[in-house]
UniProtKB/Swiss-Prot annotation:
Present in an inactive conformation in the absence of bound ligand. KITLG/SCF binding leads to dimerization and activation by autophosphorylation on tyrosine residues. Activity is down-regulated by PRKCA-mediated phosphorylation on serine residues. It comes from Callithrix jacchus (White-tufted-ear marmoset). Residues 26-520 are extracellular. The chain crosses the membrane at residues 521-541. This is Mast/stem cell growth factor receptor Kit. The gene is KIT.
Amino acid sequence: MRGARGAWDFLCVLLLLLRVQTGSSQPSVSPEEASPPFIDPAKSELIVSVGDEIRLFCNDPGFVKWTFEVLDQMNENKQKEWIMQKAEATNTGKYTCTNKHGLSSSIYVFVRDPDKLFLVDRSLYGKEDNDTLVRCPLTDPEVTNYSLKGCQGKPIPKDLRFVPDPKAGITIKNVKRAYHRLCLHCSADRKGQSKLSEKFILKVRPAFKAVPVVSVSKASYLLREGEEFTVTCTIKDVSSSVYSSWKKENSPTKLQEKYNSWHQGDFNYERQATLTISSVRVNDSGVFMCYASNTFGSANVTTTLEVVDKGFINIFPMINTTVFVNDGENVDLIVEYEAFPRPEHQQWIYMNRTFTDKWEDYPKSENESNIRYVSELHLTRLKDTEGGTYTFLVSNSDVSSSIAFTVYVNTKPEILTYDRLMNGMLQCVAAGFPEPTIDWYFCPGTEQRCSAPVLPVDVQIQNTSGPPFGKLVVQSSIDSSAFKHNGTVECKAYNDVGKTSAYFNFAFKEQIQPHTLFTPLLIGFVVVAGMMCIIVMILTYKYLQKPMYEVQWKVVEEINGNNYVYIDPTQLPYDHKWEFPRNRLSFGKTLGAGAFGKVVEATAYGLIKSDTAMTVAVKMLKPSAHLTEREALMSELKVLSYLGNHMNIVNLLGACTIGGPTLVITEYCCYGDLLNFLRRKRDSFICSKQEDHAEAALYKNLLHSKESSCSDSTNEYMDMKPGVSYVVPTKAEKRRSARVGSYIERDVTPAIMEDDELALDLEDLLSFSYQVAKGMAFLASKNCIHRDLAARNILLTHGRITKICDFGLARDIKNDSNYVVKGNARLPVKWMAPESIFNCVYTFESDVWSYGIFLWELFSLGSSPYPGMPVDSKFYKMIKEGFRMLSPEHAPAEMYDIMKTCWDADPLKRPTFKQIVQLIEKQISESTNHIYSNLTNCSPSQQKPVVDHSVRINSVGSTASSSQPLLVRDDV
């Protein structure tokens, strides 16, 4: 080894001597003719093993410089020969020889190291949408499968593309933001074994793809001189390299600002730039702009500063300051005013008396920078003595201001005196405002309607001696000697408000002979005609006051502004596929009866299959029904056929419209209405929703064996079936066995009796509320408004499945205390939303209010809402003022929260039925939810997904059942 090295040294010296000897005789080489140096060994790559010698010689006649590059490191050597006696893996890299002309040659050296296959620079940064290099060059080029792998065996993203280079590393193409914090290894196979480098954590610098988001703490500021002005601008972007600054428009002055910044996550950067002027002056007023920019673009936002030398108050009357109002009417005096600083004292004054109530003052806007306020004085049922000057005063720390309203009360004339004077004059004195006019009339006899005018001989006008702005007194006289016959003189005083009359009856000595025949006949005719008119009017009034039968359910066709447009049910098509032969119906007992019709239990033969019979409910009209009632029942049939089937509504099964009175065939619900069911179950209610109380429930049911079941006669809507022996199943087993949605008749008597003997628990109540919400959500998806949702209108069938119905035809609302007479309608006031009571507005949101009342009924086990409170003016007033019922005894806190949201005074803040379903789903047990889902999947018709009505409705109004509001001004 030493001999070879010595020979090599000798050869190098010899070559140098030859160059020195020949160099002086050769001409100099120009840069244009220069050539790059020659490296020995003459290879582009050199592979050595760790510990071997690296000897590189740069052959060039002039000065040379060696540079060694690996990763981001560079070493230099100004010798022509680069010698590394014991090579290490870190000596792997590119060796470049450069001559004095700047020309260079290079060789890449690999130093194989069995323990170090990769040279690693663990810092790994990449810019979004650009390429980045994973610096893991190889020390041995003779490996395979040089690639990237995820840490801990995780796969790399499918869209990650890379290009390997043994000398530089692996280039990741088109870096994405999703690669941020991606853990990677460089991987290669050597001699059949996979080798991994140290791990890299890729940090991605996001690219700007949008302008910064800029906002300010307030859009405008109003300050007095000397106060501090502070405004904060918030800049949001993906990176801290975003630029921002405060500028004042039309001012080159540099503004002093402070910064505070932080990162919220990897690509959410937020900066706050706060501008402060410690003591403002009037000339500081102007527009300040917060400007931010990145490589994508710029954005800005402005705030306005107004500086005043002192505070101010400006008052703006919203009505004329001179007000005329009729006696007994109401008037509101309204002002708007601007006040800065905030007002400290406000008051209304009348005749040196300060009002302590009847007025309200509030800011016009909830905006923090609002300086505009509203003050209203409410004067109710003004008397004639309450005219005068009403003054509004307001003040703040700097200034005070006021405005006066002059109120005149218009009063109907009042005749103060009417006398016969000693000189034969008749005098009439009247008072009123505006000034009354007095006219005189004469008629012969004792008539009370005189028509012949008489001119007065003396008229005097004087102001009243009462309080200011009071009545004006007018005096008028006539000479009675001008009248030659017995008669009546009328003094009529009138103005714009009304009129009043007084009469003078007098007789002269001569008597006028009355007609002996004509007058009695005329009087008799008038009396008879008057009585007949009165009788006709009474009969007409009673007929018009009689509640008319109509379909409660309304289907919305479209919404125009603030009005619903309903589909006229009479115009809906009727599909004769629903026709069922009358002779296949066998009628039984009456389930319910009302003023217009009744519901009868019946057996239908061959309704589904020719060899089956099933129990159904049939709606029909009474023989005394009018044409309007017949049309209403047909409309109800068309609405039911339009809605289609759903598990939680009483579904249409068929109809008979040909060859006789209209019959509507619907599902039969064995337990009757939910209200009576809850009341029957009060004594056996278990305050738990865990089904592991089944044995306790059965034991309790044995103690209450006399409790009514589906065969009891106490409920008007029950199936009469003979009792059978059976074993009582658990409630969950009973529900699983129910085949809801199938119309095929089967013997359900044992199941019905079993279900009714089961106790009632909290899980049942939650299930009922959940099912009714599902049914109402279905109706809302069909644009249908119920308008009478209550426990009495919910039926219960086997499996404790609830079904929503409309009892309008078969309920005796005349004798039902839940329905209050208003106009020509009887309405369930305690279940109605405020907008329905006061404005006749029926919407999806008013149904949500009624649902909240239904929940209160449900969790009070059938109690009447607002217990002990009659429907009177006090009730209406409490509803207006936001009175709501307390939580019923058995309601969980979550359910009472739902009730309160249903009773929100703002209809838009009430939840939709779809949202209510989602809220209750969180309360019911998994088994109940699973059972209900299974029952829904067994439904014979595929139910369409429920559409949230809040997507379509803006809580607009409609005139519906009654043509007049339920509450007028005199009611409260």
